[in-house]
Curated annotation (Swiss-Prot):
This is Ferredoxin. GO terms for molecular function: 2 iron, 2 sulfur cluster binding; electron transfer activity; metal ion binding. Residues 4-96 form the 2Fe-2S ferredoxin-type domain. Binds 1 [2Fe-2S] cluster. It comes from Desmonostoc muscorum. CDD domains: fer2. Pfam families: Fer2. [2Fe-2S] cluster binds at residues 42, 47, 50, 80.
Amino acid sequence: MATFKVTLINEAEGTKHEIEVPDDEYILDAAEEEGYDLPFSCRAGACSTCAGKLVSGTVDQSDQSFLDDDQIEAGYVLTCVAYPTSDVVIQTHKEEDLY
């Protein structure tokens, strides 16, 4: 099992947190375990509450059913169903930017 460095950036609050996330754990779950309060609602990849924007790196979010191909291509990620597949940097709290 690989572990990756996930950097979570909240531009509105000016915060940046780095956490280690195993490749078999969702980013949202790992962030919560570390005490970070990220937005979420369904926890199933079926809404946009937890949306973030991928700055660098790659994730597997094949469990999600909400984002369309254009949004995924633009770098949006649902942290509740995203596994890191490399070191990643994600801007959090991006739900409003989807629309």
